[in-house]
Structure formats: structure tokens, C-alpha cells
UniProtKB/Swiss-Prot annotation:
<keyword id="KW-1003">Cell membrane</keyword>
<dbReference type="GO" id="GO:0005886">
    <property type="term" value="C:plasma membrane"/>
</dbReference>
<dbReference type="GO" id="GO:0008417">
    <property type="term" value="F:fucosyltransferase activity"/>
</dbReference>
<keyword id="KW-0808">Transferase</keyword>
<keyword id="KW-0472">Membrane</keyword>
<protein>
    <recommendedName>
        <fullName>TDP-N-acetylfucosamine:lipid II N-acetylfucosaminyltransferase</fullName>
        <ecNumber>2.4.1.325</ecNumber>
    </recommendedName>
</protein>
<comment type="pathway">
    <text>Bacterial outer membrane biogenesis; enterobacterial common antigen biosynthesis.</text>
</comment>
<dbReference type="GO" id="GO:0036065">
    <property type="term" value="P:fucosylation"/>
</dbReference>
<dbReference type="Pfam" id="PF07429">
    <property type="entry name" value="Glyco_transf_56"/>
</dbReference>
<comment type="function">
    <text>Catalyzes the synthesis of Und-PP-GlcNAc-ManNAcA-Fuc4NAc (Lipid III), the third lipid-linked intermediate involved in ECA synthesis.</text>
</comment>
<keyword id="KW-0997">Cell inner membrane</keyword>
<comment type="similarity">
    <text>Belongs to the glycosyltransferase 56 family.</text>
</comment>
<dbReference type="GO" id="GO:0009246">
    <property type="term" value="P:enterobacterial common antigen biosynthetic process"/>
</dbReference>
<dbReference type="GO" id="GO:0102031">
    <property type="term" value="F:4-acetamido-4,6-dideoxy-D-galactose transferase activity"/>
</dbReference>
<dbReference type="InterPro" id="IPR009993">
    <property type="entry name" value="WecF"/>
</dbReference>
<keyword id="KW-0328">Glycosyltransferase</keyword>
Length: 359
């Protein structure tokens, strides 16, 4: 029997760390198909912190792709589980036959599915990637992303799967201890990545609420982002008074980030695609409603779980926000499909499907 190989095809430290830690702590002990990884980027202590996994690191995305293609050609029974897919060479290999459809299983992370960049090289590459995506053996994704993908590729198998957000189920009831009143605090974006469209989001918040709310913008990740942080701060101070705007430029530890989220009354996410599920989950767990772009298909997942959804096009005010908080507080968090531990069983199913052990 050939053991499934997992591929992290791009050097995205935060996401890769979450995936590796999840597999090491939760999946590796019960499945031999949850232990082999090929990772783009440096070790950064992963080998030491994930002793249950067999990890191979590659200095570049291209080097990793070449190694994957060589393995795929050497043994056509070898299957790969691609987590996210930000690696041009791997898509081209699927397109050209270097990797066969029966070898290629893909967990969509959102950004790797949507065509949002206006850069020339991306606009030229997107049509090729779209064709390649139609050759995937099976995709795993959120309900909204599965729906989006199926419109383009109705013949490709799709299975529900959620990114393994680090969550403590015991905190599901913690929000009940918080009494929310006074000036609203609004979280804008889930990181410092430009995909959050921070400046447009700040303007949208100002248009809805004026300079009457506290605005918190977490921008400690990714690193080396000071120029963009300064740009966002300047735009924010043109709208909000200094005491109402908090730009967080330092990377935060998980517990500190969790404490920050629980001080908020509303999350505001203007991006028109699925991203930031981890932050959304932690906000929902704390009974903090989220404002989404109507083009972000994750609203379908939220509606399926009977969670209130606010949209950027809605008329928002404190009364609307407090009512959404009340509705969230009435939801039994233990039944939400994309919360821990409920997302675990779909992961076990995904491993069996990708390994060829389940229909």
C-alpha cells in the first residue's frame, strides 16, 4: 500500500504551522495517511514540534513542485493531498499530465480558487489554472466554496471540509459572561494582508457609524509590512479620531489575540471571497456577529448553521448589532459544523477518500 503524501506547496508559515500542528496532535496517531508531508519553506522548528510527522522541506516552491512531480511520475499509484495550492508549477503539472487527476486531491483555502488579482501574470495564468482545477480528483472545501467551484466544474467530486481552526470548545459558553454595552468596538480585517482591503473597509465602517465607534485593525501578520501599515494608519486617521482607532502592528500570541477578539462587538470583513475562517469562528464562538461581503460565499455556511449574517450592504447601527449578538447567544455552539470538534470527522473521511480507501 502507498501512503498518502500531504503537500504544503507555498511558504505560508502561519497556515502551515496550523495544519502541521493539527495533523501532529489530532490525526497522525489514528491514520498512517496523516504523517507524510512535503513542505515549501524552512523547517522553523516544525520537525521538533511535530514529532509524529515525517517532514521534508524544500527551499522554494519550484523545488518542491519538481520533487512532487518526480514522485508522481515514478509511481502512478502515489496520491497527494494538496492543502491550499499557491504553486504555479503544480497546476501546470496537473494540466500537462505530469500529475494525474487520480493523484491530485485538493483542499481549497479560498485565495487559491478565486481570481481577484489584476496583475498581468495572474490574469494570463488564471485561465490555465481554471482548466487544471477541472482535472482535480476531488476537492474539499467549505459549503460556499464547493458551490462556487461546482458552477465551473460540475463533474469534479466535492466534499465538505473546514480548515482546522484552533478552538477550545469549553469557551463556547464564555461569551455569556460578557455584558455588552456602550460604544461599539469593531474589528476590521483578520490580518495585515492587503486582501483585507483595510482602507475600503475603514471607509465603509465610517460611512455606517461615523466617528462614534472604536475600530481595531490587527496587522501584525505578515511580517515586513510597515509601509502598508503606515498607509492604513494614515487613511484611518483621516476618518477616525486617534482615540477611536487602534492599529496593531505587532504579531500577537494566540491567547492575546483571543482576548482582543472578545473585547469586540462586531467583525467587519469586506473581502469578496472566503478567507479568515479562523477569526470568524473565534468571533462567532464569542457571540460577536460578523459583517460579510455578499459575494463572500461563506455566508452560505453560516446560514446553513442558522447563524445571523450581516452584509456590507445592510443598514447597520448599534440596534442591529445588538440584535445579532442576541441571536448568536441563542445558538447552541456545540452543533456548529465548522467548529471543533465537529470538523474532525470530515477530516477522517477526507483522508480515506484521498488515500483511495473510501468511495
Amino acid at each position: 500500500m502507498t501512503v498518502l503524501i500531504h503537500v504544503l506547496g507555498s511558504d505560508i508559515p502561519h497556515h502551515n504551522h496550523t495544519v502541521l500542528r493539527f495533523f501532529n496532535d489530532t490525526l497522525a496517531a489514528t491514520s498512517e495517511h496523516a504523517r507524510e508531508f512535503m513542505v515549501a519553506g524552512e523547517d522553523n522548528g516544525f520537525t521538533e514540534s511535530c514529532p509524529a510527522l515525517s517532514l521534508r522541506f524544500y527551499g522554494s516552491k519550484k523545488a518542491l513542485a519538481q520533487a512532487v512531480i518526480a514522485k508522481a511520475k515514478a509511481n502512478r499509484r502515489q496520491r497527494f493531498f494538496f492543502h491550499g495550492q499557491f504553486n504555479t508549477s503544480l497546476w501546470l503539472a496537473l494540466l500537462s499530465g505530469g500529475i494525474k487527476p487520480a493523484q491530485f486531491y485538493w483542499h481549497i483555502w479560498g485565495a487559491d480558487l478565486y481570481e481577484v488579482s489584476n496583475g498581468l501574470k495572474f490574469r494570463l495564468f488564471y485561465p490555465l489554472r481554471r482548466i487544471a482545477q477541472g482535472r482535480v480528483g476531488c476537492v474539499f472545501a467549505t459549503r460556499g466554496d464547493l458551490s462556487y467551484f461546482a458552477r465551473q466544474h460540475p463533474n469534479v467530486r466535492g466534499e465538505l471540509l473546514y480548515f482546522p481552526t484552533r478552538m477550545d470548545p469549553s469557551l463556547n459558553a464564555m461569551a455569556k459572561e460578557c455584558q455588552r454595552a456602550g460604544k461599539l468596538t469593531i474589528l476590521v480585517g483578520n490580518s495585515g494582508d492587503r486582501s483585507n482591503q483595510h482602507i475600503a473597509a475603514l471607509r465603509a465602517v465610517y460611512q455606517q457609524f461615523g466617528d462614534t465607534v472604536n475600530v481595531v485593525v490587527p496587522m501584525g501578520y505578515p511580517a515586513n509590512n510597515q509601509a502598508y501599515i503606515d498607509e492604513v494608519r494614515q487613511a484611518g486617521l483621516a476618518l477616525f479620531s486617534a482615540e477611536n482607532l487602534q492599529i496593531l502592528s505587532e504579531k500577537m500570541e494566540f491567547d492575546a489575540y483571543l482576548a482582543l477578539l472578545r473585547q469586540c462587538d462586531l467583525g467587519y470583513f469586506i473581502f469578496a471571497r472566503q478567507q479568515g475562517i479562523g477569526t470568524l469562528c473565534l468571533l462567532i464562538q464569542a457571540d460577536i456577529p460578523c459583517v460579510l461581503n455578499r459575494d463572500n460565499p461563506f455566508w452560505q455556511d453560516m446560514a446553513e448553521q442558522h447563524l445571523p449574517v450581516l452584509f456590507t450592504t445592510d443598514d447597520l447601527n448599534e440596534q442591529v448589532v445588538r440584535e445579532a449578538q442576541r441571536q448568536l447567544a441563542s445558538v447552541d455552539k456545540s452543533g456548529i459544523t465548522f467548529f471543533s470538534p465537529n470538523y474532525l470527522q470530515p477530516w477522517h473521511n477526507a483522508l480515506r477518500i484521498a488515500a483511495g480507501e473510501a468511495e
